[in-house]
A protein has these predicted regions:
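S-adenosylmethionine
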Residues: 1-408
């Protein structure tokens, strides 16, 4: 049963911008979020509904990219006639009624539905992943791969983390409601709020005032897992733009010292900007420009967080273009980097202190296997605990966390 006819006249200008964004991703190699931001900045007069339509349609096409072009029966290309066919196929699968215009002349609903039923039986096609990644997932994860992959192909939830340095969850909920943003508290992790309906929260007064950050619930688990206390000396050695550093600072109640490090200066500048907005005065940033940085900090950290570069397979829901950018060679390179980071950075942990190894990957070769190899090589460390957060069980991003104590 089809819904009302798709309004091509209303949406065509928006669709052309979606196609521009897709070209940025698949031809020019831009990350999906960057491509979307590019077209959003060019169209500042768009309404909230325009922006929502563009974002949802753009990500839906990327998420189902292989399934869509397999149904069409053509190799992917960035020519407009192909993209209109892709869009039309996507609309039919959502039970939208297509208008009788030349743009959709090759889109025949009953044929699309027949092919969709056929190709849904093939997991790699149904979930739109490359064959090599599907085979790797099955090899590493086994029977659980099918349900994990299905969960990773769903749209992500929008989760906020309350900045407890400035407010609490109840007050934040109330203030957001005043601006028309409905939220619900979740049991999975404290101080987190979920938005049942997507809204542009970045234009709200609470965001401007540093009362919250957008951060997936699984990512929020990391700082809690570290068991940081006020007054500790903590090092976040792969801090990036500081999402986890800000959370750690809040749990430390701005008491002690939190050293946020990264090898990219522009990320640390962004971290400093975010820390100022959040009121996280305990954070100090430091650029990793040589291995001497680690030697100077040897044996100093009560807690050392290693949120290492990884495949990102645990966050495919919010970064679905990773499926088409990641290659086996890149994964192999990342695993070498992960092992090197463990070997080089671990010296910053003091005896009796704890190192927390984290990846947003669902692959054991980037998680459990890396930690096992490290422990075998370093007798001065002991594995205390491991935690695997799975998208098909908790309903959030996929993460691996390990708590490792330095014993000598």
């Amino acid at each position: 049963m089809y819904r009302k006819e798709f309004n091509i006249k209303k949406y065509r200008p928006l669709i052309e911008q979606i196609f521009d964004a897709l070209e940025l991703v698949f031809t020019h190699g831009k990350m999906a979020d960057q491509a979307l931001e590019t077209v959003m900045k060019k169209n500042k007069k768009w309404t909230v509904y325009d922006r929502s339509f563009v974002a949802e349609t753009f990500y839906e096409i990327i998420r189902n990219w292989r399934f869509l072009w397999t149904i069409i029966g053509k190799e992917p290309e960035m020519k407009r006639h192909f993209l209109w066919e892709i869009l039309g196929t996507s609309l039919v699968l959502k039970e939208e009624k297509l208008p009788g215009v030349y743009l959709f002349k090759n889109v025949i609903p009953h044929k699309i539905e027949e092919k969709a039923e056929k190709y849904k039986k093939v997991r790699a096609l149904r979930e739109s992943v490359p064959d090599w990644l599907d085979k790797l997932g099955e090899k590493e994860i086994g029977k659980g791969w099918t349900s994990i992959l299905a969960a990773l192909n769903n749209p992500p939830k929008l989760i906020l983390r309350t900045n407890t340095l400035k407010t609490n969850t109840e007050i934040l909920q109330s203030k957001l409601k005043e601006e028309g943003v409905e939220t619900v508290a979740i049991d999975f992790v404290s101080d987190a709020l979920e938005l049942p309906f997507n809204r542009n929260v970045f234009r709200t007064i609470p965001f401007h005032d540093g009362w919250f950050e957008v951060q997936d619930a699984a990512s929020q688990v990391v700082a809690h897992y570290m068991d940081v206390q006020p007054g500790m000396r903590v090092v976040d050695a792969c801090a990036g733009a500081g999402g986890k550093s800000l959370h750690i600072a809040a749990l430390m109640k701005n008491k002690g010292k939190l050293l946020a490090m990264d090898n990219k200066e522009w990320k640390l500048k962004e971290l400093n900007r975010r820390a100022a907005r959040a009121g996280a005065g305990v954070i100090e940033t430091r650029l990793i420009d040589s291995s001497k940085v680690f030697k100077r900090l040897e044996g100093s950290a009560d807690r050392l967080l290693l949120d290492v570069p990884c495949s990102g397979t645990g966050v495919l829901r919010r970064n679905p273009d990773i499926k088409w950018k990641l290659q086996q060679e890149e994964l192999d390179r990342l695993k070498i980097i992960q092992a090197e980071i463990l070997d080089e950075y671990c010296i910053m942990t003091k005896v009796g202190g704890k190192m927390i190894y984290v990846t947003c990957s669902i692959l054991p070769s980037e998680g459990e296997e890396q930690v096992a190899a490290f422990i075998k090589k370093h007798s001065e460390f002991k594995l205390l605990d491991q935690l695997r957060l799975s998208p098909d069980k908790e309903g959030y991003d996929g993460f691996y966390l390990a708590m490792i104590e330095r014993i000598s």
